[in-house]
Amino acid sequence: GVTVQVWEKEDRRELRFGNHIMQSVFSKIRPDHLVLPYSRFMMLGLLFCPEPKSVLHLGLGGGSIVRWMHREFPELQQTIIEINSGVIEAAHRFFDLPRDKRLRVLCADATELVPTLAEKFDLIILDAFGDYGAPEELTRIDFLHKLRACLHYDSWLVGNLWTVTGDFEEMREQWKSTFSQVLEARANQKGNMILYGSQLSKIPEKKEFEATAKNLQRHHQLDFRKMLRELNKVF
């Protein structure tokens, strides 16, 4: 399995895997802050679902997104599937992931567990990374179809993809053949591209999301309006 490392720094704690790529960052000064830009862009999915009641996460990392959503949405039920028990242990022990009845953390292989899930979710957050990018079996079209089956008609899948591995274009094509609507936002210059997919037959123009972005920004203290400018439809 992947070696889990926790790096202790003066003002922050980092979760890294064997190759030293930073997976998650926890600010000791602002423990609930989403430090890494990509994690904030994952939350841009709230534009399409401003008050989620149920979220499925594939991949836990340090749990910063899970923790943030847990605090911001007091009614939210979250299910997390993480294959590495060491990651789950580290998230609870070093990254303040609470043990709470609203958080169901399952140590399992998502490819095996997802098809057995009976419920549907408002949002699915696909953020599973190994040593070198997303595990291939989680980016294949048959798995995307299984995720689509766990969504309501108007729900969204939000995925963190790596543009530097050479197969990004192919992965984006698979999203396009799985979902009627696909949008993308470049989260940073390092190569994180966030994709948003839904079965909706049509979605509003970008400018029509302005009011939602403004409202989300007021309630959740993330710069949704700035992030909205990076959002583009994939044709």
Give the location of each predicted region.
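A generic structural signal for alpha->beta connector loops
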Residues: E75-Q77, D100-R102, D154, F179-Q181, ...
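SAM/dcSAM-binding transferase cores
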Residues: G1-E10, E14, M22-I29, L46, ...
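S-adenosyl-L-methionine
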Residues: F17
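C-terminal substrate-binding/active-site "lid" region of AdoMet-derived donor-dependent transferases
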Residues: I141-P204
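A short, flexible beta-alpha/helix-coil linker loop
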Residues: H20-S24, F129-Y132, L157
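Conserved short-loop catalytic and cofactor-binding motifs
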Residues: R30, D131-P135, G159, T163
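The AdoMet/dcAdoMet-binding core of the Class I SAM-like
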Residues: E8, H33-Y153
